């Protein structure tokens, strides 16, 4: 039992180290600055001088954006909640909500071994797949 637990812990720690090695120093520095951060963007009407929140971004303890909300003068326009893979640190799912906080779109992602996006699956709120986006990367020597 102890051997299995040790193996699992080693695998998880190596996975997190390999995920960190995929990130550039700039990306790591950006994530470090965003740990447990909430960013609020405010707008002010030039005539009435009324102020309202335009956008809200919430970052988790690892500096990843887990929620983003867009507002208008009347309230929430939309909201996106992101879920990440614990090992790779890449986005695995995004759920978009409307102004009534009801899901309107679900996106699930697959990633290539080199860290580039491979596929994006788009689902309706009822879970039915309605489209797939495939990413193709073409490098040319010019």
State where each predicted segment sits:
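Bacterial Sec-dependent N-terminal signal peptides
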Residues: 1-23
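Buried hydrophobic residues that stabilize the cores of well-folded domains
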Residues: 20-142
């Amino acid at each position: 039992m102890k051997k299995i637990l040790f193996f699992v812990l080693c695998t998880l720690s190596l996975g997190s180290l390999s995920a960190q090695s995929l990130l550039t120093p700039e990306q790591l520095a950006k994530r470090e600055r965003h740990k447990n951060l909430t960013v609020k963007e405010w707008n002010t009407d030039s005539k009435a001088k009324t102020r309202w929140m335009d956008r809200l971004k919430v970052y988790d303890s690892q500096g990843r954006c887990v929620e983003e909300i867009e507002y208008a003068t009347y309230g929430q326009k939309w909201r996106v909640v992101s879920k990440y893979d614990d090992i790779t640190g890449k986005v695995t799912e995004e759920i978009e909500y409307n102004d009534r906080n009801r899901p309107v779109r679900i996106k699930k992602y697959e990633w290539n071994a080199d860290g580039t996006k491979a596929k994006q699956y788009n689902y309706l709120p009822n879970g039915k797949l309605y489209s797939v986006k495939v990413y193709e990367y073409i490098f040319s020597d010019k």
